[in-house]
Amino acid sequence: MDDNKKKALAAALGQIERQFGKGAVMRMGDHDRQAIPAISTGSLGLDIALGIGGLPKGRIVEIYGPESSGKTTLTLSVIAQAQKMGATCAFVDAEHALDPEYAGKLGVNVDDLLVSQPDTGEQALEITDMLVRSNAIDVIVVDSVAALVPKAEIEGEMGDMHVGLQARLMSQALRKITGNIKNANCLVIFINQIRMKIGVMFGSPETTTGGNALKFYASVRLDIRRTGAVKEGDEVVGSETRVKVVKNKVAPPFRQAEFQILYGKGIYLNGEMIDLGVLHGFVEKSGAWYAYNGSKIGQGKANSAKFLADNPDIAATLEKQIRDKLLTAAPDVKAAANREPVAEVEEADTDI
């Protein structure tokens, strides 16, 4: 850059700082690039698929899938992991369907969990914005976007047409709260439902509710599906679950993780660690027997997972070994993610 351009740039930067305050414009090289802090999902495989060891703080995340696929269970697992780190969490229950007893079984400290059951979509999003701006909340879950019903629709007649109201509400709210979420370093998770588009001949007819705004503003989008049943004899005790990272602004997307959700217990982490340990050479498998560090830990996956549950120190060591091996490339990705600007999107006029 020649001297005239340097002087012009210095003058412009000086004027910007006087008008908007120090730090309004900064050089990326003046400060060390820090890794994006993440909150574990409670699933080791999903943490690895996300590339940074969990869901990114200071960002919006969307989790969507069919009914009974594990959406709420996954978000409650995130809250449980965050609370273990001393985080303060809130649950905006627009569906009015949160079960405190089930949340407690998944490890959530329900006594410390902030819960809101708003009457309208505007109220839910306003409460979310106020919680974010308090700078005191680390994780907020909104369950769900489909239940964020605009006030005009609630007060109207049952058969009235309200085209695009929910989409406009989401677009306006996300424009308002995105910057606040980044400043507060708060993770906001929106749970969403699936609808079918009519008349689609090619491609998937599936879409999510609430318009297109959330798709743009979300840094991470997770598609969660139930792929089968976990059985003990003839009794169904859980679900085989697959989560695909459909969008990821902080690491490479389109990775996926498969794990089990056990009814009344949540994500089967110890079973995941056995599978990943065998896959990456930390756990040896010979026939039906599993061994770790040369010592047999159990016959069959269930007994080996029980050994890890009974020996948390060994489980923590194995988990750290797996994370250290599979998340070594994450810092470069995280640094690159910090350079991404937040995109402004056009308001979605229709709910598609």
Swiss-Prot record:
GO terms for cellular component: cytosol. It is found in: Cytoplasm. GO terms for biological process: DNA recombination; DNA repair; SOS response. Pfam families: RecA, RecA_C. InterPro entries: AAA+_ATPase, DNA_recomb/repair_RecA, DNA_recomb/repair_RecA_CS, P-loop_NTPase, RecA-like_C, RecA-like_N, RecA_ATP-bd, RecA_C_sf. Its main location: cytoplasm. ATP binds at residues 65-72. Disulfide bonds: none annotated. Keywords: ATP-binding, Cytoplasm, DNA damage, DNA recombination, DNA repair, DNA-binding, Nucleotide-binding, SOS response. GO terms for molecular function: ATP binding; ATP hydrolysis activity; ATP-dependent DNA damage sensor activity; damaged DNA binding; single-stranded DNA binding. The keyword Nucleotide-binding applies. Belongs to the RecA family. Can catalyze the hydrolysis of ATP in the presence of single-stranded DNA, the ATP-dependent uptake of single-stranded DNA by duplex DNA, and the ATP-dependent hybridization of homologous single-stranded DNAs. It interacts with LexA causing its activation and leading to its autocatalytic cleavage. HAMAP family: RecA. This is Protein RecA. The gene is recA.
